[in-house]
């Protein structure tokens, strides 16, 4: 007879009990298999005693044996007496989620599967491809280089073609063998021709000395049209090609086009002035416009060359040095007098006209011919002709009119020259100064005293050199404008 067992202990059965257990197992095999459930073992220490099959009954954990809900070993075939429970039998079939990420701290004692084949997720590790994967063998992704797309495609096509060939050979036998033989011979002959032609690559036009390089022809759908009526798409493509031909090649216009005669764009005619292929062969307006622009540019270049030619040997009449041969490149400038054609460098003539040892009538006159000049115009080139000098003076005045007068100071100060000042008199809001009306009796009262007062004011400013910038220091002398009042 079976003895009643206390909870948490193992039941020992007799022969009749074993027969009853076998009958129960047979009934369970015939009945539908239920969904397996996991029953937590009893938390009591030493949950069972050793069974007849060698189980040590250390119990309490899932690795102590196969227990049912009452804590008794079912004595099934799964129990081998080594302490492996049915809970471990199904957990070992589940991959450990922490092992997938390489962070399982249980190691070999983990109840779940640590199979490498289950861990791989089928995705190649991008850090392994870069050579910087910190997980190493513990990484859950594959550490292998994937096949290239071309190789994979070729492998797939080869497999499909081999399968198709095997199936066709099994079904098609007879007259097709002779036909396939003829086709194979023709393919072999064509392949031999291609190989023979490829051996002659050393004689290509690219390697022949003295021959112009012509790039490969750009593939076009209209080069080999299908026989038959021309479709609408083909006509549109031909029209587009014609319109493209009307455009000049930008690479040929500035140098050399690598496509040469095979370029889809139009290569223009050579211009005699600039030496570039920029003249459209069919656009007369474009040709005339470009030629006119080249002529204007050529005239400017010639004027520049002539100006340098007549300026390079000019000697200053004060320091007796060639202006273009001075040690300081900033001193390669001329001080051109408005009413005189004598040559002076800008530094010397400014020093002469700012001297205080002589009267203003003497210092404002030419050191050689004593002709009084109202202006000293800085210039990088020597100008002697009257018309050219007038143009230079006009440009000089226009340049000065764009600079604000430091004496007017946007309305906060007072400029002694008034409307005769070359500099700009403008308020902060953008308004220009309106000329002031002279009061009756003020213009004729002792004008000499007023002139002397202004002269002393500007001579003091000239000596203090208020212009800090070198460019502004050589542009204009305010003291010279007294002669215009």
UniProtKB/Swiss-Prot annotation:
Enzyme class: transferase
Family matches, as SMART domains: RING (SM00184), ZnF_C3H1 (SM00356)
Pfam families (UniProt xref): MKRN1_C, zf-C3HC4, zf-CCCH, zf-CCCH_2, zf-CCCH_4
Substrates-to-products reaction catalysed: S-ubiquitinyl-[E2 ubiquitin-conjugating enzyme]-L-cysteine + [acceptor protein]-L-lysine = [E2 ubiquitin-conjugating enzyme]-L-cysteine + N(6)-ubiquitinyl-[acceptor protein]-L-lysine
Region (Makorin-type Cys-His) residue spans: 271-298
GO terms (BP aspect): protein polyubiquitination; protein ubiquitination
Residue ranges with Low complexity bias: 1-32
Stretch list, region Disordered: 1-63
Keyword annotations of the record: Metal-binding, Repeat, Transferase, Ubl conjugation pathway, Zinc, Zinc-finger
SUPFAM superfamilies: CCCH zinc finger (SSF90229), RING/U-box (SSF57850)
Entry-linked InterPro entries: MKRN-like, MKRN1_C, Znf-CCCH_4, Znf_C3HC4_RING-type, Znf_CCCH, Znf_CCCH_sf, Znf_RING, Znf_RING/FYVE/PHD
C3H1-type zinc finger segments: 90-117, 124-146, 243-270, 399-428
Pathway: Protein modification; protein ubiquitination
GO molecular function: ubiquitin protein ligase activity; zinc ion binding
Role description: May act as a E3 ubiquitin ligase catalyzing the covalent attachment of ubiquitin moieties onto substrate proteins.
Record protein name field: Putative E3 ubiquitin-protein ligase makorin-4
Native organism: Homo sapiens
Lineage: Eukaryota, Metazoa, Chordata, Craniata, Vertebrata
Gene expressing this chain: MKRN4P
């Amino acid at each position: 007879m079976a003895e009643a067992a206390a909870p948490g202990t193992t039941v020992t059965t007799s022969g009749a009990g074993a027969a009853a257990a076998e009958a129960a197992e047979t009934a369970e095999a015939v009945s539908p298999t239920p969904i397996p459930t996991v029953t937590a073992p009893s938390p009591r220490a030493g949950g069972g005693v050793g069974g007849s099959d060698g189980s040590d009954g250390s119990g309490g954990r899932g690795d102590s044996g196969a227990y049912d809900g009452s804590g008794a070993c079912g004595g099934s075939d799964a129990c081998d007496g080594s302490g492996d429970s049915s809970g471990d039998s199904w957990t070992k079939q589940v991959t450990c989620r922490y092992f997938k990420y390489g962070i399982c701290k249980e190691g070999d004692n983990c109840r779940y599967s640590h199979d490498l084949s289950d861990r791989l997720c089928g995705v190649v590790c991008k850090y392994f491809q870069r050579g910087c994967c910190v997980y190493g063998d513990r990484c859950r992704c594959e550490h292998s280089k994937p096949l290239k797309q071309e190789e994979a495609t070729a492998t797939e096509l080869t497999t499909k073609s081999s399968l198709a060939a095997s199936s066709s050979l099994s079904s098609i036998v007879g007259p097709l063998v002779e036909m396939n033989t003829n086709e194979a011979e023709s393919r072999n002959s064509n392949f031999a021709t291609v190989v023979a032609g490829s051996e002659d690559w050393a004689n290509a036009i690219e390697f022949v000395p003295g021959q112009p390089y012509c790039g490969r022809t750009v593939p076009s759908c209209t080069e080999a049209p299908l026989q038959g009526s021309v479709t609408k798409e083909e006509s549109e493509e031909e029209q587009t090609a014609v319109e493209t031909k009307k455009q000049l090649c930008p690479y040929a216009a500035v140098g050399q086009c690598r496509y040469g005669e095979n370029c889809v764009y139009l290569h223009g005619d050579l211009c005699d002035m600039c030496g570039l292929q920029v003249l459209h062969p069919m656009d007369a307006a474009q040709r005339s416009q470009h030629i006119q622009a080249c002529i204007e540019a050529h005239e400017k270049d010639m004027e520049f060359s002539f100006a340098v030619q007549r300026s390079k040997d000019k000697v200053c009449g004060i320091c007796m040095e060639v202006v273009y041969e001075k040690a300081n490149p900033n001193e390669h400038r001329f001080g051109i007098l408005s009413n005189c054609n004598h040559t002076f460098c800008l530094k010397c003539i400014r020093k002469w006209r700012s001297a205080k040892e002589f009267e203003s009538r003497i210092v404002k006159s030419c050191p050689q011919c004593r002709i009084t000049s109202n202006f000293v115009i800085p210039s990088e080139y020597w100008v002697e002709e009257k018309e050219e000098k007038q143009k230079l003076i006009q440009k000089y005045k226009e340049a000065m009119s764009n600079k604000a007068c430091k004496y007017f100071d946007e309305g906060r100060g007072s400029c002694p020259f008034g409307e005769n000042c070359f500099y700009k008199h403008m308020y902060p809001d953008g308004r220009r100064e309106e000329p002031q009306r002279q009061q009756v009796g003020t213009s004729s009262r002792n004008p000499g005293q007023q002139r002397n007062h202004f002269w002393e004011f500007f001579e003091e400013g000239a000596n203090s050199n208020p212009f800090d910038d070198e460019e502004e220091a050589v542009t204009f002398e305010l003291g010279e404008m007294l002669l215009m009042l």
